[in-house]
């Protein structure tokens, strides 16, 4: 009974995990295009999927814990060894783990992209406000001064 419930939870998480992966890929494209409206929509949808996946993950862990098993792959293997749906449990669990690993990798890349864009924006603002490094040149070809503030039209 617990094994079938666990299998159902795993199967129920496959579609949301695939949707999350698709959203993360869309987010990557939107980040490159700096499309804020699309990013806001993606964020809202991402959050609901993450909440759902976390809830199901906790339920799966609770089922394994109730049975006195480890709440990881070895616990799932122990349950599968005594279950009529054991091979399905392991195979679907592997599929879900692979999807979630892909989601984590895509999310990491998106995070790095955000950090890069933040650094670029901060550098651009520093240049606009006259705080650029002395190795940069002004319109006359002379080395600009570090703390020289100027109007935006002169930047």
Regions found by a protein language model. Name each.
Residues 2-81, 91:
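Extended, charge-rich alpha-helical scaffolding segments
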Residues 78-155:
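Short terminal interaction segments
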């Amino acid at each position: 009974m617990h094994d079938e419930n666990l299998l159902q939870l795993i199967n129920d998480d496959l579609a949301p995990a695939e949707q999350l992966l698709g959203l993360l890929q869309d987010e990557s494209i939107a980040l490159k295009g700096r499309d804020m409206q699309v990013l806001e929509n993606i964020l809202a949808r991402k959050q609901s999927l993450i909440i759902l996946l976390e809830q199901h993950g906790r339920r799966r862990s609770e089922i394994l814990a109730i049975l006195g098993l480890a709440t990881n792959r070895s616990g799932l293997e122990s349950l599968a060894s005594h279950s009529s749906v054991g091979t399905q449990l392991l195979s679907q669990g592997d599929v879900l783990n692979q999807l979630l690993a892909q989601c984590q990798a895509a999310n990491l890349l998106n995070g790095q992209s955000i950090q890069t864009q933040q650094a670029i924006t901060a550098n651009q603002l520093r240049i606009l406000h006259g705080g650029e490094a002395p190795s940069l040149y002004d319109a006359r070809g002379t080395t600009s001064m570090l703390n020289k503030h100027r109007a935006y039209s002169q930047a």
